[in-house]
């Protein structure tokens, strides 16, 4: 099993091209040469990568027009906002992206290389301590499913650990494909706790709450209150029950005492980038933002930096 995207950045273009081909022809069943294509990218995506994406869309797939948008900005649009800070955590990478009037502020974007795949690996490790063995890529998919179905974020980690130790109220059972039933207790909240305490994974980094706070502090003092009041969670690794309440508690502890803090956790958080893309593409003003095949032929791949920002 290979992953052409590492930490949110495409690293294997041949495989990525195969995935796009499969998406167009097998999943969407559309001819790419007949439709404009909106692609999304990670924050701080290298310039060469944006150019490569653009080149593949026009030269391999013959798209009539295309546009590249930053994922976090689309998530913010999906929440009905144009100003706010997005904590976007997917499978390979987590970013905090402050956005003002629709534009990401690159100097204040922070990246944390801790996301869904790391949490799945960690859950595999702590389930092994319980005597269950998960090692193969197939078994990793099972553990990912356990994670998505049973894990949650504790409001108070120490207190939750005490509860788990003194009673079986937090235990849940899960049936494996072979019919074996396993029981999982404090692992349910120990796994996503690593988002707040990366030291659990042996990482030096600060947690997602501090990363969000640090990102806000890199912004102009005049816009900070708009960011605190519009903190939007997005991506599959923000889908844990309890994550918004915990975030509210942690940011409140870090922020000035009078600050109004609002954490927005959309129920469809794992699709909010896609939803934001459909909003952007349906705006009446958007048609003049596309890069056309003609513009590409005249200017080459670097056109993407002039038209998509």
From Swiss-Prot:
- Pfam families tied to this protein: Actin
- Give the UniProt subcellular location, in the record's own words: Cytoplasm, Cytoskeleton
Where is it mainly found?
A: cytoplasm
GO CC annotations, alphabetized:
cytoplasm; cytoskeleton
Alphabetical keyword list: ATP-binding, Cytoplasm, Cytoskeleton, Hydrolase, Nucleotide-binding
EC number(s): the record gives 3.6.4.-
| Superkingdom of the source species | Eukaryota
GO MF, one term, reads: ATP binding
Catalytic function, reaction form: ATP + H2O = ADP + phosphate + H(+)
User: Which family, according to the similarity comment?
Assistant: Belongs to the actin family.
Q: What does this protein do?
A: Actins are highly conserved proteins that are involved in various types of cell motility and are ubiquitously expressed in all eukaryotic cells.
What name does the UniProt record give this protein? Actin-3
